[in-house]
Amino acid sequence: MKVYLLQDLPGTGKKGQIVDVAEGYARNYLFKNNLAILADEKLIEQVKKREEREQRKEEERYQKALDLKKELEGKAVVVKAPGGETGKLYGAVTTRQIAHALKEQLKLEVDSKDINMPDPIKSVGVYDVDIHLFKDVWATVKVKVEKE
């Protein structure tokens, strides 16, 4: 029996999915507890259309991320931080500072959680920083750290 799930059910499916379940399970548990409704042809068609729309949106976001990656590759941002005469900084450059520099200099809104630095930046120099744009799309941007 095909049912439309109204909630996530471990082992059965996620909310909004149409799944095939045993008739007894559907009637005695899913329907009685308002966890699912019977999936008729009209509902199945609506779910298919919704999934196709979501797939198209996903592909568009992926393509935008690829375009943005091409645009960002090779670009650099400058971050100024207080430091000593030897080139060592008094603190470390944070992902939040890099996100702010990206916003100010390249007009790119990036969440600081999407910026990946292998090690903290604690001295003046040029560093490669990875930015997570979409699922498996990463862009590398150069960050030039200068002393204030």
UniProtKB/Swiss-Prot annotation:
A GO term for molecular function: structural constituent of ribosome
SUPFAM superfamilies: L9 N-domain-like (SSF55658), Ribosomal protein L9 C-domain (SSF55653)
Keyword Zinc: no
Transmembrane segments: none
Pfam families: Ribosomal_L9_C (PF03948), Ribosomal_L9_N (PF01281)
Any one GO BP annotation for this protein: translation
Keyword Ribosomal protein: yes
GO cellular component: ribonucleoprotein complex; ribosome
Keywords associated with the record: Ribonucleoprotein, Ribosomal protein, RNA-binding, rRNA-binding
Family: Belongs to the bacterial ribosomal protein bL9 family.
Record function comment: Binds to the 23S rRNA.
PANTHER family noted in UniProt: 50S RIBOSOMAL PROTEIN L9
The protein's name: Large ribosomal subunit protein bL9
Species of the source: Coprothermobacter proteolyticus (strain ATCC 35245 / DSM 5265 / OCM 4 / BT)
Gene: rplI
